[in-house]
Amino acid sequence: EGFDAWILRTVTKVNPKTVPSLPEELKFIGSASAGTDHIDKEYLSHNGIQFDHSPGCNANAVAEYVLTSMLTWCSSTRGELTNHKVGIIGMGHTGVALAKKLQAIGVSYAGYDPPKALREESFRSCHLDTLKDCDILSFHLPYIDQGRYPTHHFMPDILSLSPKHKLIINAARGGIIKEDYLLRHNELIALSNKKISFILDVWETEPVPDKVLVNQAFIATPHIAGYSKQAKIQASKGVLRRLLSHFDSEWTDSKLQHKQMDSTKNKLGEASNCGFNKKTNTLILSVL
């Protein structure tokens, strides 16, 4: 309490269960992150609280993680990435960043994003059948569990594995791929020597992933693909600019006061100590 705004990160969930009573003076919540699935936006809207975040802040970091992972996998198979076709599922900030990097080194790719095709006349999404002919699939979708284009268990509900697939990468959100499906698939074809490799940075059961899946993954990481120093700075500055705009204030470095906090602690009380007081026009920043 005592703040007009909260600046949070993805480790802090805001919904009726975690925060059953929101302070009356709270008017803005900003998340220094690209994703928003940790925030119940309808709950905030119902309480008259505006929400904003930093879309695309870690796109380059994630794209570099994915490209490096692809090259590492190719090296392990004594193959070359230019001899593989990559299917990019989700052509938002990260998907586009990855596409540019692949194009720069001569790798063929196909981008799948029907919702984007509806929004932007200049973009054409590939067909699902095209993805079945790709050697590598990289997922860059937001987590959506309802509506016209849900992404929950996109694989296998919308796209199933095909004989052409060799590598599956998910550095987007846990739950987009049904993890049991990957394990069952590899169990069924274990004797044929055609197991699919997978690289996972996100998990259905975060923060504790399935140990069997971790052991079988070619690369397994704890949701850190976007954790570059530059990405964190961009995330922080992006959400702070939006916060200041909400309160009709201009961005100046003199308004920043840095406060060191333990980013590993998942307590809303401590996260809420990072806030904005419009009476003093001061930001207390702990997200850098």
Task: Give residue spans per PLM region.
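Phosphate-coordination loops involved in phosphoryl transfer and adenosine-cofactor binding
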Residues: 26, 82-86, 165
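Phosphate/diphosphate ligand-binding glycine-rich loop within oxidoreductases
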Residues: 4-78
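Oxidoreductase and adenylate-handling cofactor-binding alpha/beta cores
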Residues: 63-79, 104-107, 238-245
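Rossmann-like dinucleotide-binding domain for NAD(H)/NADP(H)
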Residues: 165-288
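Glycine-rich adenosine-cofactor-binding loop
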Residues: 55, 63, 80-103
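Rossmann-like adenosine-cofactor binding region
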Residues: 14-18, 116-211
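NAD(P)-binding Rossmann-fold cofactor-contacting core
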Residues: 104-121
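N-terminal glycine-/charge-rich "phosphate-binding" loop or analogous flexible N-terminal tail
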Residues: 1-5, 110
